[in-house]
Amino acid sequence: IEEFLREFNGEGIQHIALICDDLVACWDKLKANSVPFMTAPPETYYAMLHERLPGHGQPVDELKTRGILLDGTTEGGEPRLLLQIFAQAQVGPVFFEFIQRKGDYKDGFGEGNFKALFESMERDQVERGVLKVEEKV
């Protein structure tokens, strides 16, 4: 956001979101046409998906291979999901977001992914010994 504000001297359109019926197939077509995507989250993000969204029913290996994020809810046994991926900025700091909504997912814009990404990066750092977990006494 900071880069955008600096580049354009204020507010404006930061990104453009496009909805897809099949985000995995969409990603494959975009990648075949050399669209660059933002760096995929660490392995731990995908390892934590079943904890965060039990019973989500999505092909984690396909999501992980492509760096696709998954958010939503599985409460009541009916997954309501948002799949999302971000292309690298190609028009100044403006970037494209590609999404797919599944079930009756109408609310939200992937807010749960912000927390999940942070937690997965932290877990990855702990596993690599870069970050030490302090024990509470």
Q: Where in this protein do the model-derived segments appear?
A:
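Glyoxalase I/VOC metalloenzyme domain signal
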Residues: 1-137
